[in-house]
Amino acid sequence: MAKAQVGPGAPPLPTHLQLEVTSACNLACAMCLVSYRPAINRAEGAMPMELFRRLVDGTPELARLTLQGLGEPLLQPHLLEMVAYVKARGIAVGFNSNAMLLTRERADRLVAVGLDWLHISLDGATAATYEGIRSRADFDRVAHNLRGLQEAKRAVGAATPAIQVVFVAMRRNLHELPDLVRMVSGWGVDEVHVQGLSHDFADTDPAGAYAGIRRFASAESLERVDPDLVSDVFARARDEADRVGVRLRLPAHQPTPVRREPSQPGCSWPWDAAYITSSGVVQPCCMVMGDDRVAMGDLGEADLADIWRGQAYADFRAALSSDTPPAVCAGCSLYRRTF
């Protein structure tokens, strides 16, 4: 195993932070951990502005900030203030959204404050498929709100936020991908990012809490679908994207062996980025999710710099640089190259 580097031997502070600005969500999506945990209300789920400022100000080389976790960012009451705070410091900032709360007024404000990117989750080309995956969502409202965001940009001649549609590909919605590419191109969207399920959750299961999402991932993962069928749908989606002028990003649908040089990690996250929950728990990346699975430290007890240079991070980096990665990484779609 690679030597654990603590203190001055640790890597420089991260250039990218992903902050869960709220853990509250207005939807309950079939593939999301939110659907398998107790409900979290808006007040309990919000990251305090004081913690947000402390993180931004305490990470001097920060170049990119993603305001995204298990919750819906538009439920964070200080979201616009957060975006303005980092834009004033020259930091690129954006987030993912289900767009249910993206009214025209909110769209106008996000454009005005200089949001760099906004990724809209849309996992179907029909209301039946989409609403079957995202409980409490409304397909027509999302379509209306996405078009409203495009209009808000046109109204002031703004190039940002860059808009991307994110499609989480599963057994139940794969067949609609070519139609989705064609549909969103008609709304002025020029980029679609297709992702696989984020994790198989097979590595750890505290008190049985992850049994439900583990069963879902096992049944719905593209790894369990006929590879020829997946390849055919991807090829048709690619042809459609070429025809309508949409940039299409497709994942591998079968795991790719992690090829690396000795002592080189299979993933760079713990060296250049960190994920922080709304309550201040520091985790090695955004794919870990539940803070009972892996935690590097708590910002209520130490600063990010001390946690970053601490023993827990050093041991995690050393394991990730070895032939036996941390158990939580083994089932991760980023590590397996299927995300």
Label the predicted regions.
Residues 36, 69, 122, 196, ...:
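Residues that line or immediately flank small-molecule/substrate-binding pockets and catalytic motifs
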Residues 79, 135-138, 309-312:
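Amphipathic alpha-helical protein-protein interaction surfaces
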Residues 1-117, 128, 132, 140-141, ...:
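Conserved alpha-helical substructure of the radical SAM core
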Residues 78, 105-109, 173-176, 226, ...:
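Residue-level recognition of alpha-helix termini/interfacial anchor residues
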Residues 42, 50, 89, 112-302:
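Radical SAM enzyme [4Fe-4S]-AdoMet core and its adjacent flexible, acidic
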Residues 1-40, 57-60, 242, 253-262, ...:
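N-terminal pre-core extensions flanking Radical SAM catalytic domains
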